[in-house]
Amino acid sequence: MTRFAGPVFVAAGLRTPFGRGGGALSAYDAVSLSVPVVKAMAAQAEPDLLVWGTVIPNMGWSNIARETWLDAKLSPTVPAFSVVLACSTSMTATFAAAGMLGGGTELTMVGGSEVMSRPQIALTADASKRLTDLFASDPAAALGALQALTPRDYLLPTKGWANRITGRTMGDHMEETAKAWQVTREAQDDWALKSHQRAVAGWERGFFDDLVIPLPELARDANPSADTSPERLAALKPVFDRDSGTGSLTAGNSSPITDGAAGCWVATKAGLARLPTGTPYARLVDYEVSAVDFHTEGLLMAPAYGIPRLLARNRLSFADIGLWEIHEAFAAQVLANV
């Protein structure tokens, strides 16, 4: 089956290397880090539409897609809009673009960017109102009040990456899920070790050479480590549950704060023909968007609900799929979901 009026294809794009938070790419913001990807992809073909996303809010723009496209000095007549859905933002961009194909839109560029090194500092509602009122009535007094702001007048929009509803981070939630599903520390470390080994092997054999755009500050991913070993992983202490004695998520089996940008193509058959010969592609047949009550079911457990529904709708089983790619924020998350 397919949910689309005609065949839809996803074709390989490009990305930056992924840098560690506070590391080589921390001087970028989400727009400037997106520009090299968008420019390089646009050199292959000009899309009919750009759909781009980012999660961490920025007060400097409201439409990262349009800002990126124009900063890349590309045609101002190409429309662009932004999406956001937490860690699924770029995937959501793909689904949104797929639903807009046809009627002259044959080739779309989709993707996203995140610079977790640079969450913007904002003012509290009280401080913001105080300054806004002063600027309207007495600009000189407002400047004085601005200089007199104290730490309690500021806040991070992400509040230390915590969920707004629960006040807990993804790691806090995942620690609870790992306990609930009895995902052991050993299983997590084993999965993390394999992930490091596979990523390093991919770089060594040149798999990423035509997928990653080297930047002046960073040429390859900073996170995969060739010297990761079972012993080194086992020696790490829990980072989210440090007190109970049963914490299992560590810096070794959890993904770090990361900076990067990535894009791909979503196209009709006619759109594919506009890409360079030999561009890898796959057909997008269907998709599923799911949500959970993260007070009781775990913040990162939506795939456990979405995957069975998607398979059932297409009369497939888990074993029928030859390759699964599941967002690996934590080793425990993948293990709990599958």
Predicted features along the sequence, with ranges:
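Flexible glycine-/small-residue-enriched beta->alpha junction loops
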Residues: 108-176
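Conserved catalytic cysteine-centered active-site region
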Residues: 28, 54-107, 165-169, 227-256
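Buried hydrophobic positions in well-ordered alpha/beta secondary-structure cores of metabolic enzymes
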Residues: 11, 47-50, 90, 97, ...
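Conserved active-site "lid/cap" helical segment
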Residues: 2-72, 76-79, 87, 169, ...
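Active-site-proximal alpha-helical scaffold in enzymes
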Residues: 84-114, 178-207, 263-271, 338
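Active-site pocket-lining segment
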Residues: 57, 218, 285-338
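N-terminal extracellular/periplasmic Venus flytrap/periplasmic-binding protein-like
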Residues: 15, 27, 31-36, 187-274
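Beta-strand segments within the central parallel beta-sheet cores of soluble alpha/beta enzyme folds
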Residues: 46-53, 79-84, 108-112, 187-194, ...
